[in-house]
Swiss-Prot record:
One of its GO terms (cellular component) is plasma membrane. It is found in: Cell membrane. The lineage of its organism: Bacteria, Bacillati, Bacillota, Bacilli, Bacillales. This is Cell division protein FtsX. The chain crosses the membrane at residues 25-45, 172-192, 220-240, 271-291. GO terms for biological process: cell division; chemokine-mediated signaling pathway; positive regulation of sporulation resulting in formation of a cellular spore. Part of the ABC transporter FtsEX involved in asymmetric cellular division facilitating the initiation of sporulation. The gene is ftsX. It is a multi-pass membrane protein. Belongs to the ABC-4 integral membrane protein family. FtsX subfamily. Residues 1-24, 193-219, 292-297 are cytoplasmic. Residues 46-171, 241-270 are extracellular.
Length: 297
């Protein structure tokens, strides 16, 4: 496209915005509210994924070995478990190591258990991790049936509920965001339709004298682009300011736990870029949907 032609399309796009001032304001306001909600939902979903990933990384199967099992029996059990599909790693932990872990995890209260160092009631353990955390329950059920297994612990019931909750939350978030984006496209499309109705005779004349569809389409595409980008400015500003404060408060109270928010950078800048891109795309798509029927003379 020639620079002169592009300049003409840009001028027309800006002129279209000023011709319908109130509708432009209404559309930008609607896109602003929509993208703000999209930004909030994306922030919530991405941080929820962050929490879920941290939890998933901590999900493990603790296989307590039958005290009657000899060293050769333990080796066979380890070999059998390693043959299970989707097992990522198997780590042996002696009962002495298990007691130390218990004492450490309980802090000051754990000192009471130091009395058991001479007569340790705990069992030797294999710590098994799945390649995909969602396969933990399936792997645990297979291990339970093996010889020389005293019992298996992996948070039965809680793990399944956790994964179901995370999956449901993600799906709900996706549906809500899709609905909001559709609403924004509908509003932009209606705004541009008003401009096109006002210029329908001009468009027909341009078609009759040989103007290509794209020559006619470009100013409206740019108008939609401008509407979408303008609508993203306020949501980005609000997210940049509020996320910093929210992260400080959140991490001050829950720092060091799995419930730490994503780092301010690069998260907010990635989100800002995504909102600009979403705004531009829904604006241009709204334009495409509104103008196509007018390109037939």
């Amino acid at each position: 496209m020639k620079a002169k032609t592009l300049s003409r399309h840009l001028r027309e796009g800006v002129k279209n915005l000023s011709r319908n001032g109130w509708m432009t304001f209404a559309s930008v306001s609607a896109v602003t509210v929509t993208l703000l909600l999209v930004g909030v939902f994306l922030t919530a979903i991405m941080n929820m994924n962050h929490f879920a990933t941290k939890v998933e990384q901590d999900v493990e199967i603790r296989v307590h070995i039958d005290p009657a099992a000899k060293e050769a029996d333990q080796k066979k059990l380890e070999d059998d478990m390693s043959k299970i599909a989707k097992v990522e790693s198997i780590k042996y932990s002696s009962k002495e190591e298990e007691l130390k872990r218990l004492i450490k995890s309980l802090g000051d209260s754990g000192k009471t258990f130091e009395l058991f160092e001479q007569d340790n009631p705990l069992k030797n353990v294999f710590v098994v991790k799945a390649k995909e955390p969602t396969d933990t329950a399936t792997i645990a059920k297979k291990i339970e049936k093996m010889q020389f297994v005293s019992n298996v612990q992996y948070g039965k019931g809680q793990v399944e509920r956790l994964f179901d909750t995370v999956k449901t939350g993600r799906n709900i978030g996706i549906v809500l965001i899709a609905g909001l984006l559709f609403t924004a496209m509908f509003l932009i499309s209606n705004t541009i339709k008003i401009t096109i109705y006002a210029r329908s005779t001009e468009i027909e004349i341009m078609k009759l004298v040989g103007a290509t569809n794209w020559f006619i389409r470009w100013p409206f595409l740019l108008e939609g682009l401008f509407l979408g980008v303008l609508g993203s400015i306020i949501p980005i500003g609000l997210i940049l300011v509020t996320y910093n404060s929210l992260q400080g408060m959140f991490n001050e109270k829950l720092g060091g736990t799995i419930f730490e928010l994503l780092p301010y950078s690069p998260f907010v800048f990635q989100l800002a870029g995504l909102l600009v891109l979403i705004g531009a795309l829904i604006g241009m798509w709204g334009s495409v949907m509104s103008i196509r029927r007018f390109l037939k003379v």
